[in-house]
Design a protein with these regions (language model features):
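Membrane-embedded alpha-helical bundles of multi-pass transporters/translocases
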Residues: 2-231
Length: 231
């Protein structure tokens, strides 16, 4: 006999705001990777656009491979004390450090700079995926009510737009004031305390998940290959 779904109480607006705070630094990190990195490393650092394009492609392929693994491991930890937020809390300082390394590279030769760029891109993508996958999965578990889920996504994406605006405006403003190299370094330095504070507030103040999903079976790893059958 199947039980009817339980209608969850309306989630507090303040709790939704707390959950959505982490989407601001996530958006602040995502936009510069695609928009600012090519220009910064080509115009300021002196790496060829051909090399940058190849490195970005390689990093994206790596990201596509690791994302299902990170999702699988996130599922394995969701029933622990801190649940998925273990990954969110671990990814935040890693992403902060990687953004600083990406936009404040040391003085290196051209060949070593390419290795530095690919290393920073891999760390940025890994940290970003650690955060985003578990963060968005947590949001889906706050409620099973369609209306409440719409509120969760609306708050999260609305706050994400704030991050997009900051990511688009701050590097340009800082670069015009201090020069491109110093401007991007300052942007990365601002990003560090910002993401740590926002993620801490999200982890501590977010609404508790209401959906209890069955424990992942040992054979669940093979389920990641199921979407490939549709190709």
């Amino acid at each position: 006999m199947s039980s009817s779904p339980i209608i969850q109480a309306r989630t507090s607006t303040w709790r939704l705001i707390a959950y959505s705070l982490a989407s601001i630094p996530l958006a602040m990190a995502a936009l510069p990777i695609y928009v600012n990195v090519p220009k910064f490393y080509a115009d300021v650092i002196g790496v060829s656009l051909t090399a940058i394009g190849g490195l970005l492609l390689a990093a994206r392929v790596f990201d596509a491979i690791q994302d299902p693994l990170l999702g699988y491991w996130s599922d394995r930890t969701r029933h622990t004390k801190w649940g998925r937020f273990v990954w969110v809390a671990a990814g935040a300082p890693l992403l902060a450090a990687a953004m600083l390394g990406l936009f404040n590279p040391p003085a290196l030769s051209a060949n070593l700079m390419m290795w530095w760029l690919v290393a920073m891109l891999l760390v940025v993508y890994t940290a970003f995926s650690m955060l985003q996958i578990s963060y968005q999965a947590y949001g889906a578990e706050i409620s099973d009510d369609p209306v409440e889920r719409t509120r969760v996504v609306s708050f999260r994406e609305g706050f994400g737009l704030i991050g997009v605006f900051l990511a688009a405006a701050l590097p340009q403003i800082l670069s015009s004031q201090y020069g491109p190299r110093e401007g991007y370094a300052i942007f990365a330095l601002i990003f560090i305390p910002f993401i740590l504070v926002m993620v801490t507030l999200t982890v501590w103040l977010s609404p508790a998940p209401q959906i209890r999903i069955a424990t992942v079976s040992k054979g669940a790893f093979s389920n990641m290959l199921l979407p490939l059958k549709n190709l």
